[in-house]
């Protein structure tokens, strides 16, 4: 399931989204992304949750609701806020005792197998969490 959700994250790059950090936890996810002007943060969240729901039902046989309604988002305004969010995302599995080190968790941008996009200084990144 986590692989399917990451595929949906990665597919958002086709729409110009830049992925900077992410973690896929057993019951929620966090993502730090820059969403292009033609795509709102709300629409990006819909694409992620809706895209995953559609594929999970089709490919994994899920029935019913996959996600809770809504999501949490926050525009990143300062470098300090950016560093705090990056740390929070990377350390989430460690805080939940799912890994001893962030790099060991298989579904996190802290793991070196994932290629993340650079964050330009002038970019307007958003932090999104969902259950």
Residue map of PLM features:
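Short catalytic/metal-binding and nucleic-acid-binding patches
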Residues: 1-131
């Amino acid at each position: 399931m986590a692989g399917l959700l990451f595929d949906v994250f990665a597919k958002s790059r086709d729409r110009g989204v830049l992925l900077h950090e992410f973690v896929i936890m057993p019951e929620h996810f966090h993502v730090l992304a820059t969403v292009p002007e033609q795509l709102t943060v709300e629409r990006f969240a819909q694409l992620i949750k809706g895209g995953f729901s559609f594929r999970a039902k089709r490919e994994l046989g899920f029935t019913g609701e996959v996600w809770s309604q809504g999501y949490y988002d926050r525009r990143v305004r300062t470098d300090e806020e950016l560093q705090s969010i990056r740390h929070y995302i990377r350390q989430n599995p460690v805080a939940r005792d799912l890994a001893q080190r962030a790099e060991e968790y298989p579904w996190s941008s802290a793991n070196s197998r994932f290629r993340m996009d650079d964050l330009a200084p002038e970019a307007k990144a958003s932090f999104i969490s969902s259950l």
